[in-house]
Amino acid sequence: MAESHRLYVKGKHLSYQRSKRVNNPNVSLIKIEGVATPQEAQFYLGKRIAYVYRASKEVRGSKIRVMWGKVTRTHGNSGVVRATFRNNLPAKTFGASVRIFLYPSNI
């Protein structure tokens, strides 16, 4: 049997980028599993992110849909990254799982 290869790591959508009083929904903060420092997070810059969810209406034979984004830069000292999505993630996804794909590769 063929060996399976891991194509993505899991992450959590924490929040939007924000200041004391203002939210910026264009930028989402993502916590990647197993990443604890900005140096470790550097590896994921430019990687593609997918938020996979199920909808009630079937489109083209599937109820599963995806919102795509990209890791843009690190955020803070705890290994959190900033990401932009083609369409902003809705606020109901705070705490939801996202997939950070290991491509495009820069190794």
From Swiss-Prot:
It is found in: Cytoplasm. InterPro entries: Ribosomal_eL33, Ribosomal_eL33_CS, Ribosomal_eL33_sf, Transl_B-barrel_sf. One of its GO terms (cellular component) is cytosolic large ribosomal subunit. Gene3D superfamilies: translation elongation factor selb, chain A, domain 4. PROSITE patterns: RIBOSOMAL_L35AE. N-terminally acetylated by acetyltransferase NatA. GO terms for biological process: cytoplasmic translation; ribosomal large subunit biogenesis. Keywords: Acetylation, Cytoplasm, Isopeptide bond, Ribonucleoprotein, Ribosomal protein, Ubl conjugation. The modification N-acetylalanine is found at residue 2. It holds the Pfam family Ribosomal_L35Ae. One of its GO terms (molecular function) is structural constituent of ribosome. Disulfide bonds: none annotated. Its main location: cytoplasm. There is a cross-link at residue 47 (Glycyl lysine isopeptide (Lys-Gly) (interchain with G-Cter in ubiquitin)). Belongs to the eukaryotic ribosomal protein eL33 family. Component of the large ribosomal subunit (LSU). Mature yeast ribosomes consist of a small (40S) and a large (60S) subunit. The 40S small subunit contains 1 molecule of ribosomal RNA (18S rRNA) and 33 different proteins (encoded by 57 genes). The large 60S subunit contains 3 rRNA molecules (25S, 5.8S and 5S rRNA) and 46 different proteins (encoded by 81 genes). Component of the ribosome, a large ribonucleoprotein complex responsible for the synthesis of proteins in the cell. The small ribosomal subunit (SSU) binds messenger RNAs (mRNAs) and translates the encoded message by selecting cognate aminoacyl-transfer RNA (tRNA) molecules. The large subunit (LSU) contains the ribosomal catalytic site termed the peptidyl transferase center (PTC), which catalyzes the formation of peptide bonds, thereby polymerizing the amino acids delivered by tRNAs into a polypeptide chain. Present with 65600 molecules/cell in log phase SD medium. There are 2 genes for eL33 in yeast. This is Large ribosomal subunit protein eL33B. It comes from Saccharomyces cerevisiae (strain ATCC 204508 / S288c) (Baker's yeast). The gene is RPL33B.
